Amino acid sequence: MSEPLKPRIDFAGPLEVEQNQTLKTQQTFSETQAQTFAPAQVDEPLEDEGQAEAVIDAALRPKRSLWRKMVMGGLALFGVSVVGQGVQWTMNAWQTQDWVALGGCAAGALIIGAGVGSVATEWRRLWRLRQRAHERDEARDLLHSHGTGKGRAFCEKLAQQAGIDQSHPALQRWYASIHETQNDREVVSLYAQLVQPVLDAQARREISRSAAESTLMIAVSPLALVDMAFIAWRNLRLINRIATLYGIELGYYSRLRLFRLVLLNIAFAGASELVREVGMDWMSQDLAARLSARAAQGIGAGLLTARLGIKAMELCRPLPWIDDDKPRLGDFRRQLIVQVKETLQKSKTPREN
């Protein structure tokens, strides 16, 4: 039997002709030049923004030097000396029945105890913030794991930290969807699809509300100093609410550390995205011609607040972003533009009447 005829293949583009490389003239190096020759180092670009952030963060992080260790050792020795001297004063006051000195020692002990307790609480909260980064790395490993037994316990721990009750509908759906034959990757993926969006939706609403308030405040208020104070207060409050939402209790130092990480991430990773998002609106809708200068400043402040909230959400979230579940700045941008336009239209309507 004869073979069937194959269909015709049409080539739309022209055939690529191999280009012969031209040979360069020979260069001869002397023995002295050959001995001192060193190849030039070519700077390789970073693979992604995350690697660039890690390099910058490592460069800005203070290194543990010998002087710092000496200072910490001196402070520890001073603390032990204060405690020992206080015990000796207490014993002497008890033996001599000096009740005034004994009361002073008791008051000092209470103050020192309160200070130690405060330091311990701050350290625990700071440790909890650092532990969230380790949990995110653990979740990333589980999402690439084919083992079994660890995913369910890990997700139950995350639900407990976030304050999600066992009777919550989302958690009940997750329990009904998992079974023993699923591996850790499937269990964690189901948790990210069924339970985690509940917290993410609340965080998105907080970001949207804060961004809208910042936008309207800047667009209406005539005082720049009041605007700056209001925006700073709202941004700090937004970070606190997002951290509390994801089960992280912030202290003084942990709040400063989180705020520093958020600003560092925005400065070195989000500038290009922010410029791109704002530029798309300005070019496509010609907002500079339609809105006043104060309204444009309000939209810019609202976008910065939204960017701040997104980065705080990313740092406090126990799971890495999966697929396209990361909130985009463009979603908040369109909402802010609509709110500013409605506010301007409402302000013009009474004047016309």
UniProtKB/Swiss-Prot annotation:
Entry membrane topology: Multi-pass membrane protein
Entry annotated with the keyword Lyase: no
Domain of life, source organism: Bacteria
Major place of residence: membrane
Gene Ontology CC annotations of this record: plasma membrane
InterPro entries assigned to the protein according to its UniProt record, in alphabetical order: DUF697, UPF0283
Keywords: Cell inner membrane, Cell membrane, Membrane, Transmembrane, Transmembrane helix
Pfam family, one: DUF697
Protein's cellular compartments: Cell inner membrane
Residues passing through the membrane, by range: 70-90, 99-119, 213-233
Family of the protein in this entry: Belongs to the UPF0283 family.
Annotated protein name in UniProt: UPF0283 membrane protein CKO_01392
Species classification: Bacteria, Pseudomonadati, Pseudomonadota, Gammaproteobacteria, Enterobacterales
